[in-house]
Every structure is written in C-alpha cells, then in structure tokens.
Curated annotation (Swiss-Prot):
This is Large ribosomal subunit protein bL20. Disulfide bonds: none annotated. Coiled coil: none annotated. GO terms for biological process: ribosomal large subunit assembly; translation. It comes from the Bacteria. GO terms for cellular component: ribonucleoprotein complex; ribosome. It comes from Mycolicibacterium gilvum (strain PYR-GCK) (Mycobacterium gilvum (strain PYR-GCK)). The gene is rplT. The keyword Ribonucleoprotein applies.
Length: 129
C-alpha cells in the first residue's frame, strides 16, 4: 500500500468543511465534495449580498423619505433639491430616521425645503408658467 503522509491534515480539512456546512440540506451537509461546493457558493453569495445590502438600505431610506415628504405636500426629489438649496446637509439615513421618529421635525425640514425652492417649482404640475 502507498504511504499517506497527510492523513491528519486531510481529515482536519474535511472536518472543518463539514462543520461549516452544518445546516445545509441533504448531501450538502454530509458529503465532503458537495459540502465544499456549497460552501464556495455560500461565501460568494455572502460577499455579493454584503455589497447589495448597502443599496437596499438606501432604497428603503428613499421610500420612507418620499412617503413622509408626500404627507407634507412635497415630493422626494423636490425635498432633496430644496434642502440642498437651503444648505441643509442631512444624509438620507438620518432624514429617514427623522421621518419615522419625529414627524414635527421632518415637517419643519420640509417647510425649509419648500421655502428654498423657486416659486414656480412649488406650483402643482399644469399651473406653472
């Protein structure tokens, strides 16, 4: 028989892969080759979704800001344009938090944004000009 020089290392490697694949369905948690393939895919998905999470949160913040802005009679893009024109530097994360937790403060910010916009921008569509 051939001599196996790396038996302990191979066993340890297989054991760590199978330990990491605990909780996968079927053969993917029991067979080394399937577990190794699934682990590679899982790590790829985790990397991809860590990047995607940032965009997902930004979408959520924008949705919340838009909903609160419309309650105050202004759209999201006009709110952001007005805040920039007024020199108010609040990022979307904090603006969404204010919109959810403190409606009065958000209403005040909406009024500041409305005041900073040109007069014809505040008119409903169809009446401008």
């Amino acid at each position: 028989m051939a001599r196996v020089k790396r038996a302990l290392n191979a066993q340890k490697k297989r054991r760590t892969v199978l330990k990491a694949s605990k909780g996968y369905r079927g053969q993917r948690s029991r067979l080394y080759r399937k577990a190794k393939e699934q682990q590679l895919h899982s790590l790829t998905y985790a990397y991809r979704d860590r990047k995607a999470r940032k965009g997902d949160f930004r979408k959520l913040w924008i949705t919340r800001i838009n909903a609160a802005a419309r309650l105050n009679g202004i759209t999201y893009n006009r709110l952001i344009q007005g805040l920039k024109a007024a020199g108010v530097e609040v990022d979307r994360k904090n603006l969404a938090e204010i919109a959810v937790s403190d409606a009065a403060a958000f209403a005040a910010l909406a009024e500041v944004a409305k005041a900073a916009l040109p007069a014809d921008v505040n008119a409903p569509s169809g009446e401008a000009a």
